[in-house]
Amino acid sequence: MKQKYLTFLCFYLIFNIAIFSQIVNEGTLQIEPSTTVYFGDEYTNKSAATHNNDGDLYLNNNFINNGITTSVSGTTSFKSSVNAIQTISGTANTANFYNLEVDNTLMGVSITDSFGLFVENAVSLTAGDLRLVGEAQLIQVNNIPNSGSGKLLRDQQGVSTTTAYNFWSSPVNNSGTFSLNGGLFDGTDAIINSFTPQQVLFNSGSPYNGVPATVVGGNVTTPLTISTQWLYTNPAASGWNSINQSTGLAPGEGYIMKGTGAANQNFVFKGTPNNGNYSFTIASAQSLLIGNPYPSALDSWQFITDNLGVFDQIEFWVDGGSPSHYTADYLGGYAIRNLTTGVAPSVISSIDGLGGASGTIPERHIAVGQSFIVEATGAGTSIVFNNAQRTFITEGSGASVFYKNSSSKITKEVNSFIRIGYEDPEGFHRQLALGFLPNSPADMKYNRGYDAIMSGPREDELFYIIENDLTKKYVIQGVGAFEDAVEFPLGLIIEEEGVHTIMLDAVENFDKNVYLKDVVLDTIYNLSTANFIPNLPTGEYLDRFKLVFKPKEEMLVVDDVVLEKTINVYYNKNNSIIINKPSELKLNNVLIFNMLGQQLVKVTANLLSESQISIPFQFKKGMYLVLIESEEGKKTYKIVN
């Protein structure tokens, strides 16, 4: 049979019309207001074409958009009783409607993976379901309730092990709230049974583990099972609260849940798509588990900006391979995101994909189904989600992350960033981020929303010190445009003896060397070429180290102006360091360091009145630094043995 085509080059439809042939728009298709059009067969909007529907368009088949779609009024209705599944797809990867109606009496409308469906106004699921496949997303603009008996279905995956927590929030509701029993479905066979997933099962007994689905011939015969032992919410005033599968959760309310033990586990959320404004009340110093309430990505920058009077950073739990249900065995930490950038959590660096520069840095956009912790640090008490915070960004792009075991991609930003790493003797890797943001209000002072405080500090830590406030440990510092003369103070706390390492994790849009300055030794180390391993006794070093970008004429320089009185320091043939000084000059300490900044000798006795001090020194041949501290100041000398 010969296929029929109808091609529009430039066509304005202003009367009621029904067309039953394959339709291709190669120019401009304008459907005027108060005009009703029926397309019986598949409709393609080609790459150079523009589709404008301000009337009522009824589609009995698929819609393929390779071009531009616009709409300021009207309704696009996918209406069919003969085509079980109608699809929306195309190389444009997006489509724009004013109102969307699904009126398919068989199954519904399927949105292809990684496709963004933008709806200015209402979504009416009159009959049939709207299936967002994979990373497809629905983005709405107006604050208007969605309606209809049909449901939206959306996939999401998490950490699949039975001992690891995922932090979830639902993009859908059923009669205003979401419960797992009725809203969460088994997506194991979603590729085959996209519209008909089975409700997940639940257990509550020992050994308190979830169970993967039973699959025969690619089809789920027994759905996956979730252990209710590990279901919790964290309301602001209550701390962690145990819930069950029937607990109703408000849109945007977060919950945590452990996995099934499957190699990969896909879940399907099913319900009315969330849309519009949602709010939560919180008091000062309270923490709250909330999450992305929408079936689209959430722009964390806009979300934080809108709520900056309440909180100034958000925290994402990242599991690091917890081996059991015992709290003491939990591995992982909280990644942090603010208006400057994000940093990975402090976890053991040997854990694959975690703890490094490319592991689990939170990107700007929060994935569908992802929840997070906020803490009220401002005077405000109301946290608001709204449609202006929604955006279309897929996880596959690397700009949106849902926290599971695999590492995320890193996307380039227009600002410049430096990521400093610190590893303690136990192998925990802490990352600090410094952002140069020339078009922001951030400066060298504390800037709310741009500077982030460390979450869950350990005994051994490296952190930024801002405005000489020693009560706070910062992991993110945002400033203005880059200036090579500016220095950034660092705090280092050493509680455990062993190897402590400071390193350069990564730079983004930055082509200068990064140096660590030891103020005590007046020494500079190039972190761009090698790690720095201090050999220091336990203690707090809050005024010794700085991050700098301007090297001196030599990497190691002696300060010759602090002490006015003459001191002579040299190494003699008897394997001793000799210090000749005026007898009236009283010394407090003599410290000897190698060229890595490691302290080798400390002398405090017999320094008061002697004019000559002899210090036994039997170390391998090389150059060393002798730091002399007195009542008049301090001075560093170089010696060669």
Language-model regions, residue ranges each:
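Residue-level signal for pocket-adjacent positions within structured domains
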Residues: 18, 83, 112, 562-564
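Compositionally biased Ser/Thr/Gly- and acidic/asparagine-rich
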Residues: 234-250, 256-610, 617-621, 630, ...
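Bacterial Sec-dependent N-terminal signal peptides
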Residues: 1-26, 557-559, 636
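Generic beta-structure capping elements
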Residues: 3, 11, 79-81, 595
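N-terminal exported-region signature
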Residues: 23-381, 387-388, 395-397
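Prokaryotic Sec-type signal peptides and long signal-anchor helices
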Residues: 12-15, 19, 82, 101, ...
